[in-house]
Amino acid sequence: MWRGMIVLAGLLSAAGTAHANSRYFCSADDKEARFTLESGFESDAGHKLNHFRGALIVKDEAQSTVFGKRVFESQHLTNHWSRDGELLMEVFDGGGDDTDGATLDLVVVAGERGKPTANFSGSYSLTIEGGEKPYAVEGKVSCGTK
């Protein structure tokens, strides 16, 4: 009887682990930009997005008048991938009346497939198009799991 209960407890705990959610956070602060991103995905097939939020400050004076400070929500996360230690996120801000038609695209690529760790690093690229002149920068990003 005890063996049966131990096996049942083991199966239930394994089932709970299989359905746990994945939460990631990434941040960067360099001469070009300062941002934080936080996302949560279901571990089930498809990795459905639970939540996403973030904030960005563009430090370039020419760009800061349009995209100086931005807050991101779930609708801004246009692409994401998280699997086996690798994380990719694309954040797109289509602007609006306050940007005179300019758009912002922030892409984060971090981690290494096959080497999952609690803390990992990578790179980001930030592109602003549609303004007076195109703006594109790259930098390093630090990420982790919660």
Question: Model segments located where?
Answer:
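N-terminal signal peptide c-region/cleavage motif recognized by signal peptidases
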Residues: 14-17
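Bacterial N-terminal signal peptides that target proteins for export
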Residues: 1-6
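Central antiparallel beta-sheet cores of small beta-barrel/beta-sandwich binding domains
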Residues: 21-146
